[in-house]
Amino acid sequence: SHDVGFGERLKTAMAECRAVMEPFIKSRYDGALDVTIEEICDRMNTVRNGIAHSRLDLNLEAVHLSDLKIIEELLYAMRLQHLRVDTKSIQIGIKRLFGERISIE
């Protein structure tokens, strides 16, 4: 997977953890889930490339902080899913760990 870019790997991870991440994404962003995920991945890929290539004109905006929080939560979701923890338990864990004020159905 050396020739697969960060943005594509991020999209794959989001797809694999979609069920876990859905309530956290929906609590932060308006719009269709698929579109939102695509936008998060595109923005994070742009930021990553800007940092990797020392772009001094990189603009960080408030939405990037939300994106980074989602990525942080995604990392936990990926690890716990790999350990075969069930979706609801992962969501409850992320909610508690990150102090998310959302209800888990």
Model-derived features: positions:
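Amphipathic, oligomerization/interface secondary-structure segments
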Residues: 1-105
